[in-house]
UniProtKB/Swiss-Prot annotation:
Modified residues (Phosphoserine): S192
UniProt source species: Drosophila mojavensis (Fruit fly)
Name of this protein: Ell-associated factor Eaf
GO biological process: cellular response to heat; positive regulation of DNA-templated transcription; transcription elongation by RNA polymerase II
InterPro entries with a match to the protein in the record: EAF_fam, Tscrpt_elong_fac_Eaf_N
GN (gene name): Eaf
Family as reported in the entry's similarity comment: Belongs to the EAF family.
Length: 518
């Protein structure tokens, strides 16, 4: 059977045994005049085992019935003391019995105040960490709203440690919270619109409206397309003018086509050679334009790159520098083109001035035709005078019929011979005139293919072309003079230097006069 331990009774604890009657005495608290003796009760919610009962505790009563109880602890516990806080209430009907073991007297006393205290929460949190109890005391004073009494801690000597430890803990918490706030503050201005629009940041300065629209509006969109567009317009205008003037007047079309590159007095074949040179120069210029377009993309592609790459301001700045470099290159190309045009015009003008006699221009044709017409008019006048004289002589000799018949026979024979001689001259004239028209017609389409774009060839190549051009001009001029001599020889007859058509008219008049006489 199990033995259960029974609690000792009050008589056993007080060692009061038997049926004895004891006297109960009233204490001094029942005396209304008593002011020195008072009894109070203290109720704890939690009492640690480390309380040192051999030392005295302190009770501090403050205002508004606030009471602070400080109980010392054992030295081995690591916590110097335990602090309780609470309030007190006055008793009205409660009493207590005091039993004296030595004398055996029993005294009844009134209770004055009931004190109910609670252990501070800082002691519970700091006890396992073996830190002094004073370290965490101010932390509990904050949420409770009750300041720590300085009088209770004055005798212990742990007051300064309490304040320093609490300040260290609070400073750590402040640093942690302060660093978080600083990070948030630093993070917000980076994404805020005020920092992006401020002029001090380089990103905002690259996005300013003073740089980008100025280059796009004035320079980039005008300089890039200006070089090919100007040259293409001039080429189309020249080719249209040459093709329109090719059917009517070949000389005027050739003059208008070659007036921009050289003087007006150049011949047709000179303009043909110039057209060939211009074709070669235009092909070279087109190749150079293709290379430049491949090396440097057009402005539209750069704008698309800018639109797709607006996230980085450094890309915009690099693109602007690239645009400036392209514009400088284009200005240099324009200056080189102007210099080449000046050189070409100067060389062509010198060439046209140095060889004015060997060239066969349309004005030279017109002057030759006018001189031939004047010479023919003078010859007609001379022949008219001689015909009048011959007609008078034929009338005087009309009496002789035999001579008239002989003259008729002779005139008929002469007429037949002159008619036989006449067609080769006329055919040669028509053939020569037809050949000149064919030359003009063949020269006009070749001129339409030319252009006045400046050549990028070397100066030596240009001199070689000029030498070949001079040799061709000399050969063609000799050929043309030879044709003129043949034409003049075919026009003038061998008898008296009169043309065949004039002699034919003379013979017809003489035959008519002889018929009238008969």
């Amino acid at each position: 059977m199990m033995m259960t331990k029974q609690k000792p009774t009050l008589t056993e604890r007080l060692n009061i045994g038997g049926d004895e009657v004891r006297e109960l005495k009233l204490g001094a608290t029942f005396n209304p005049k008593n002011t020195a003796t008072a009894f109070h009760t203290i109720k704890y919610d939690f009492k640690p085992a480390s309380v040192d009962t051999s030392r005295m505790a302190t009770v501090d009563v403050g205002s508004n019935n606030q009471v602070t109880v400080t109980v010392p602890n054992l030295e081995s516990s690591g916590v110097p003391q335990t602090v309780y806080k609470g309030n007190h209430k006055k008793y009205t009907k409660e009493c207590l019995i005091i039993f004296d073991k030595e004398t055996g007297a029993i005294t009844l006393e009134k209770l004055n105040h009931n004190i109910q205290v609670k252990k501070t929460r800082s002691e519970m949190t700091n006890k396992p960490s073996l830190m002094p109890a004073t370290n965490a005391a101010p932390m509990s004073s904050g949420p409770n709203g009750v300041p720590m009494p300085s009088g209770a801690m004055a005798g212990t000597g742990s007051g300064p440690k309490l304040e320093n430890s609490t300040m260290r803990i609070t400073s750590k918490t402040k640093v942690s919270t302060g660093s978080r706030r600083n990070n948030i503050i630093d993070f917000k201005p980076r994404n805020s619109p005020m920092q992006q629009s401020s002029p001090s940041r380089p990103v905002a300065s690259h996005r300013s409206p003073q740089s980008a629209p100025a280059w796009h509006a004035n320079n980039a969109q005008q300089t890039l397309p200006s070089i090919p567009m100007i040259m293409d317009d001039d080429d189309f205008g020249l080719s249209a003018a040459l093709h329109n003037g090719g059917g009517g007047g070949g000389g005027q079309a050739n003059i208008s086509g070659s007036s921009t590159g050289s003087s007006v007095g150049q011949p047709d074949y000179g303009s043909v050679n110039m057209g060939k040179q211009r074709q070669a120069s235009s092909q070279g210029h087109a190749k150079r334009q293709q290379q430049t377009q491949r090396s440097s993309p057009p402005m539209q592609q750069q704008q698309q790159q800018q639109n797709y790459g607006r996230g980085g301001a450094n890309n915009n700045y690099a693109q602007q520098l690239h645009q400036q470099q392209q514009q400088q290159q284009q200005q240099q190309l324009q200056q080189q083109q102007q210099q080449m045009q000046q050189r070409a015009s100067f060389s062509h003008s010198n060439h046209s001035n140095s060889m004015p006699l060997d060239l066969d221009s349309p004005t030279h044709h017109e002057q030759a035709a006018q001189s031939m017409a004047q010479a023919a008019a003078v010859l007609e006048q001379q022949i008219g005078g001689e015909l009048s004289a011959s007609s008078s002589s034929s009338e005087s000799e009309s009496s002789d019929s035999d001579s008239g018949s002989d003259s008729d026979d002779s005139t008929e024979d002469d007429r037949s011979t002159h008619q036989q001689q006449q067609p080769p001259g006329q055919l040669s004239q028509h053939h020569h005139h037809h050949m000149q028209q064919q030359q003009h017609m063949h020269q006009l389409p070749n001129l339409g293919l030319g252009s006045i774009s400046p050549t990028y060839n070397s100066h030596q190549h240009h001199q070689q072309q000029q030498q070949q051009h001079q040799q061709q001009q000399q050969q063609q001029s000799h050929h043309h003079h030879h044709q003129q001599q043949q034409q003049q020889s075919s026009i003038y007859a061998s008898n008296g230097g009169f043309p065949n058509d004039l002699l034919q008219n003379d013979l017809q008049l003489s035959s008519n006069s002889s018929d009238d006489d008969d």
